[in-house]
Amino acid sequence: LGGSGAGGGDSDAADLVVAEIRDSGGDAIANKASVSDRDGASSIIKDAVDTFGTVDILVNNAGILRDRSFRKMTLDDWDIVMNVHMNGTAYVTHAAWQVMYEKNYGRIVCTSSGSGIWGNFGQANYGAAKTAMVGFMNVLALEGASHNMRINCLAPGAATRMTATVPGRPPIDVDAPPPERAPSLVTPAVLYMCSEDAPTGRIFQAMGGRFSQAAMYTNPGVELGTEASFETFCDNLDTITD
């Protein structure tokens, strides 16, 4: 929440959330650093540890969009989205990982997207970064298992400051979205992934009160042996793709 949807350092949203939490009787701090900066990402975890003593849960949810067809997309459009979504997630998680590993406990949520899992026109940069979350999760789920660290992906759908910038979508008041676009309807899945009973290595989709699990699969395939060739591959294509 420490930055603006345009990639700047506007921290108004973070301050508002902190105020809301404190008004409700909780305790919170805002960190104004960018997740795409290594030192800034590390400072997020350092501030949390300095203030609260440790880190039990990390939800990687920083985001930015630069939507346009790949033909019209600049490499700067590509880099800024990758730096925030992919590198930012890695940087913050790397800092938190050390704390969680030593204490033998941690819950991590990475924000993926249907734009990466299923594809969405004009979002090659965003879709690639969001699919990277799945590969990142798969490896860390293995590496963290022996230390009670569980990591999952969320593929959410809701009205936010970021989605309000998507070209072609009707304007929505993100402070008072339609009920079916309320971010609060994503919350149950996030709470589950942060709980004691959280699984690991799963992708949960959540939008408008509808929840599902997405997964990659492999079929039985066919064994062509050491004599495999283009011809035998094509001859067995029906079985390979069944």
Task: Identify the role of each PLM range.
Residues T93, A129:
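Active-site helix of classical SDR
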Residues S113:
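Residue(s) in the substrate-gating loop at a strand-loop-helix junction
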Residues S69-F70, D77-D79:
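Substrate-binding pocket helix/loop in short-chain dehydrogenase/reductase
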Residues V99-E102, W118, V134, V139-M149, ...:
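Active-site-adjacent segment of SDR/Rossmann-fold oxidoreductases
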Residues D173-D242:
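C-terminal helical subdomain
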Residues S24-D27, D47-N60, R66-S69, Y105, ...:
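A glycine-rich helix->loop->beta "capping" turn
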Residues S11, D15, K32-K46, L75:
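The beta1-alpha1 cofactor-binding region of Rossmann-like NAD(H)/NADP(H)-dependent oxidoreductases
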